[in-house]
Amino acid sequence: MDSDEEFIDNSLAVGDIVYDEAQIAQQQQEYAAQLKLASTAIPTVVKDFIQYFHRCLSDNSVYELHGCYENSFGKLTDKFYKNSHWPHPVAQVAPLVKNDPVFLYFYSELYYRHLYAKLTPTPLERFESYSNYCNLFNYILNSDGPVDLELPTSWAWGIVDEFIYQYNSYWMTKEAHNSDGVAPDTWGTYSVLNVLYSLSEKTKIREQLRAIKAGLDPMDVAGPYGSRPLYKMLGYFCVIGLLRVHTLLGDFTLALKTMESIELTKKALFARVAPAHFATYYYVGICYVMTRRYADAIRCFSHVLTYMARTKNVQGPRYDAKRSEQMYALLAICVVLSPARLDDSIHVALRDRYGDQMAAMQRGDLKLFEELFTFAAPKFIQPGDVHGGDPLKHHLKIFMVDVTNTLSTANLKSYLNLYATMDLGKLASFLDTDAEDLRSQLVTLKMKNRQLRWTEGELADGTYQHCSELDIALENDLIHVAEAKGGRKFADWFIRNTVKNYSVQDYIVNGDKKDKEKKN
């Protein structure tokens, strides 16, 4: 540096913290943006909605809150904020609600949820959303006793669901693996798990579910928190949230174990909220797929897909078309790896969507397995990976090992289907291999035909069962083949074709009248 040049220090020290010129400039821009937001006029109808929303939350008017959450917020979004932010919580909304901190927690939750859905959040906005969730859960968990607040069931699920979605979304970004980000501890895995475990334990939701299962009064074990509807709902949905987080982290056995005492039945609490219903079955099914329990995965996917197909027209915007397609793709994979008889309606829908792909996969097309798995799998994360590796590729690689081993026995099965007994050496000559290698293939086939299968109890429990129509036993060099085919169920076929028959007869009798009505 020349002696004539003058050094100008543009940094600023505030206590022990030193801000450089770039940081100060960034904060100036953010402050200017907030001032601009504050000066932007809020439409009268939006202002009235925010104030009405505030009154409903303060008065614990659950029915009115449900209308605000499910209907009004979405309609106003479409009219005014389809491609822009809602009014800023601090700069614009706080003065309208007398700086009510509780309302601002919940309004901010919706504000950032809308931002994630319609726009692209900046690193600062991701941090602000995380900070708001910290404040919200701190208020719920650490106030002096249970808070006097009630929410609609769908909103309680939405809070937990969005909390995990934003955590997942953060770890899919590059800045998550960069220690120089806005805040290194933003969306930490420990913090997220701590919230979910704290809510589920403080509400004693597992104890309540065990009491219900035993025919006892759950209020006897609920305690002061679990007896309140808000805490009970949040605690319950946090258990499903733990299933989801552990699945995203790749611990599939622990994910199933967190669902202790929650039964997959139509009477379960999650069945009251369609998105929760779909998510629960999807993540349980994924865990079964990744632990090679294909029969259980088929049972899960078949059940929820049947429900989704039957209620599609009444669900409206809550119908998750992408989730449905993902589960059909996973079901196709499972049926190829572990053939099973499906409900007739599901079989037809699956054949229409993936009939050609399934035929190709049965012939050993590994690329199709990879494509369907990549499309259908959740967005796995690996928070501790500073190198930013792709966890999806890691899980795909593990999954494809089992696929390759399973498909390696396909040619062997085609020969065994033709015989009741067969000499080991003769079959080895057919397959152009040696006897020892064939023994290894037979053991692989025997093991692949056995799966851990749920019958009763917890979701992670099960007994090893034979899950194939073909079974083998080896006596010295003689292979014994047993084939068990279950009886076909014709009820669905007769019902469906009877309905078609009636419709054809009706058209034959009244066809002219119906044609005239169409013309008119």
UniProtKB/Swiss-Prot annotation:
Which Gene Ontology terms of cellular component type are present?
eukaryotic 43S preinitiation complex; eukaryotic 48S preinitiation complex; eukaryotic translation initiation factor 3 complex
Q: Which top-level group of life is the source organism from?
A: Eukaryota
Q: Which residues form the PCI domain?
A: 278-478
- The primary location reported for this protein is cytoplasm
Keywords attached to this entry: Cytoplasm, Initiation factor, Protein biosynthesis
Pfam families cross-referenced by the UniProt entry: Paf67
Where does it reside? Answer: Cytoplasm
GO biological process, any: formation of cytoplasmic translation initiation complex
Gene Ontology molecular-function annotations:
translation initiation factor activity
**Reported function:** Component of the eukaryotic translation initiation factor 3 (eIF-3) complex, which is involved in protein synthesis of a specialized repertoire of mRNAs and, together with other initiation factors, stimulates binding of mRNA and methionyl-tRNAi to the 40S ribosome. The eIF-3 complex specifically targets and initiates translation of a subset of mRNAs involved in cell proliferation.
The subunit structure is: Component of the eukaryotic translation initiation factor 3 (eIF-3) complex.
Recorded hits in PANTHER family, A to Z, give:
EUKARYOTIC TRANSLATION INITIATION FACTOR 3 (PTHR13242), EUKARYOTIC TRANSLATION INITIATION FACTOR 3 SUBUNIT L (PTHR13242:SF0)
Tell me its family. Answer: Belongs to the eIF-3 subunit L family.
Q: Which HAMAP family match?
A: eIF3l
In Swiss-Prot or TrEMBL terms, this protein is called: Eukaryotic translation initiation factor 3 subunit L
Origin species, per record, is Yarrowia lipolytica (strain CLIB 122 / E 150) (Yeast)
Origin organism lineage? Eukaryota, Fungi, Dikarya, Ascomycota, Saccharomycotina
